[in-house]
């Protein structure tokens, strides 16, 4: 069983050792790591094959296997993400504001590291590297606890990172992997208040809920994507068709994929047959439709109440027909996971109202929700997509992994 106390102590010590690292040293190391990832592709693929074989043995679906799979191209993309982080401006030490107060004290507010970040995540091995690169660039140490399905891949990736750190003269404890997949050890990490400054869970609804219930350390909630697309009365239906097909079928296993379709009744009778025909040519979808939508499909099943709350991560989509923009907004706000939502419309006023009133981290007009991604937003590899409002919201890049500190300089000042 993993000794979490010892691991936490090492992480805390490492956070102090890497806190003074300069931008130049950090960027040089990240560039070295990006190259090492590509150079070590075959070793990483061999480790990943063990995870894939185990997953197949346990009957994991093809869609979930895709989340787990590494390929040469995906490793190259991970390396590019690391290099992009190296190329980004360093927020550490950035002066947010500076002034002299009425007492003559010189006050600066600067960005500083959080300290030790813990990350609990599922399936995707790329998260190990993405999370490390962002944590390292912001002078934070990181503890990674991945799912048991990606254990071999995560071990190989973290081993490579630690070797690269050591070869560069930097403490390898800047990154540590919890290899014990037990729930007991995960809960220990959630409660490690002496060592962990913030915990970021990244995974399905069950994981997020467990962390919310059991964590004693501060948590930034991420991930679950019950994402909707609303097709308005004034929508371009050709555009809507293309966007829904992209958002639902391109990669259904990711959190920015659409799960719910909301349609204005004025266009439902035209749009549903049009969409069904077009999507069947790409990838058939199981429609779970409400009473108004059901008779408009050639093939659909009646929706149950829980279907409107579910992140399917599959070729399944709930469908709701509404009578107004106001009803669409109300419905979405009732069922959203506060991740990403979209409206398809040519009505500028409706678009503005939707963006202002829908309670989500990213709200789109006439675009696929699949764009909610730190890399796409220019933040580099993201550590997660926050669905809460405090500290960080939406794709979390470098600034989300910093805090601020006030630096006050005086000359014998005392307060009367």
UniProtKB/Swiss-Prot annotation:
One of its GO terms (molecular function) is glutamate-5-semialdehyde dehydrogenase activity. Pathway: Amino-acid biosynthesis; L-proline biosynthesis; L-glutamate 5-semialdehyde from L-glutamate: step 2/2. It comes from the Bacteria. InterPro entries: Ald_DH/histidinol_DH (IPR016161), Ald_DH_C (IPR016163), Ald_DH_N (IPR016162), Aldehyde_DH_dom (IPR015590), G-glutamylP_reductase_CS (IPR020593), Glu-5-SA_DH (IPR012134), GPR_dom (IPR000965). It is an enzyme of class 1 (oxidoreductase). Keywords: Amino-acid biosynthesis, Cytoplasm, NADP, Oxidoreductase, Proline biosynthesis. Its EC number is 1.2.1.41. CDD domains: ALDH_F18-19_ProA-GPR. It is found in: Cytoplasm. It catalyses: L-glutamate 5-semialdehyde + phosphate + NADP(+) = L-glutamyl 5-phosphate + NADPH + H(+). Pfam families: Aldedh. PANTHER family: DELTA-1-PYRROLINE-5-CARBOXYLATE SYNTHASE, GLUTAMATE SEMIALDEHYDE DEHYDROGENASE. Catalyzes the NADPH-dependent reduction of L-glutamate 5-phosphate into L-glutamate 5-semialdehyde and phosphate. The product spontaneously undergoes cyclization to form 1-pyrroline-5-carboxylate. This is Gamma-glutamyl phosphate reductase. The lineage of its organism: Bacteria, Bacillati, Bacillota, Bacilli, Lactobacillales.
